[in-house]
């Protein structure tokens, strides 16, 4: 498992290192310390909030205090990454973003550490402890095909070139990298290695022509259109007619 964001891999390693129930206890302790909501226990009415509008108003003060203390920490130790993960749970759309000063700078989101999120963490923390899973934070262009075969599968989930997601601000992912990733997958295909690529073909009036032309040049690749509902996300488009076309592209049935 590889991610270019070293913070993500550090959190994964933390989840591998600590017993699952201890992870949950530490997160609960941070939530309690900063006075963040616990809708799993208390429900929404306790915080004078409705599910549709979310918990952002209630959590804003505690969230900002947690974020400020995290950004002032000198050591990036286990405590830092548990606090960072808790921020992500309460952040806008559960995303991660740092500014040029390496400060986490996302605003508070609508949700908290509810039952759904808690179960996801529990299941992931158990799965990541599998000793066969290797963790790395390398440039994808430097990941060799050594050891991979026709029984292997490469799953690529890059930042989406034509969206304005927080993880792709400041031109973190560009056309050159998009082309290099597609060329990397072509080389994998030439070696008989299976791949699956998550991406966006259209987003409103924008089209990922690099991806479209790549599919046209490679008719053997299979496009699977995905239909996701992001009704619980913190961001809602004003013009819902301008939808996004998300796809999974594979070189196998």
Tell where the protein language model's regions lie, with residue ranges.
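Class I S-adenosyl-L-methionine-dependent methyltransferase module
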Residues: 1-129
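Conserved proline-anchored active-site loop of SAM-dependent methyltransferases
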Residues: 1-6, 12, 85-92, 138-139, ...
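Conserved SAM-binding strand-loop segment of SAM-dependent methyltransferases
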Residues: 22-23, 133-138
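Mobile active-site "lid"/loop adjacent to the S-adenosyl-L-methionine
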Residues: 100, 104-111, 160-180
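A structural motif corresponding to the C-terminal end of an alpha-helix
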Residues: 120-134, 183-196
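Short, conserved active-site loop motifs that form the nucleotide-linked donor/cofactor pocket
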Residues: 132-133, 152, 221
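Short conserved loop adjoining the S-adenosyl-L-methionine
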Residues: 143-148
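Long, positively charged, glycine-interspersed low-complexity recognition regions
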Residues: 161, 170, 175-253
């Amino acid at each position: 498992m590889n991610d270019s964001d070293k913070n993500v891999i550090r959190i994964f390693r933390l989840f591998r290192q600590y017993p699952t129930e201890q992870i949950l206890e530490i997160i609960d302790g941070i939530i309690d310390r900063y006075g963040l909501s616990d809708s799993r226990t208390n429900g929404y009415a306790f915080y004078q909030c409705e599910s549709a509008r979310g918990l952002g108003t209630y959590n804003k003060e505690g969230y900002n205090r947690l974020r400020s203390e995290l950004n002032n920490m000198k050591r990036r130790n286990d405590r830092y990454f548990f606090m960072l993960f808790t921020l992500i749970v309460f952040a806008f759309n559960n995303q991660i973003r740092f500014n040029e000063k390496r400060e986490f700078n996302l605003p508070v989101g609508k949700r908290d550490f509810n039952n759904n999120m808690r179960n996801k963490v529990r299941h992931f923390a158990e799965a990541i402890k599998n000793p066969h899973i290797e963790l790395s934070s390398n440039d994808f262009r430097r990941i060799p095909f050594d050891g991979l075969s026709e029984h292997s599968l490469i799953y690529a989930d890059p930042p989406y070139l034509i969206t304005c997601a927080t993880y792709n601000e400041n031109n973190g992912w560009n056309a050159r990298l998009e082309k290099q990733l597609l060329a990397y997958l072509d080389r994998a295909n030439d070696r008989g290695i299976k791949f699956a690529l998550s991406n966006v073909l259209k987003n409103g009036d924008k089209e990922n022509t690099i991806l479209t032309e790549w599919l046209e040049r490679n008719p053997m690749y299979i496009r699977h259109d995905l239909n996701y509902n992001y009704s619980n996300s913190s961001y809602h488009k004003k013009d819902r007619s301008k939808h996004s076309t998300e796809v999974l592209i594979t070189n196998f049935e």
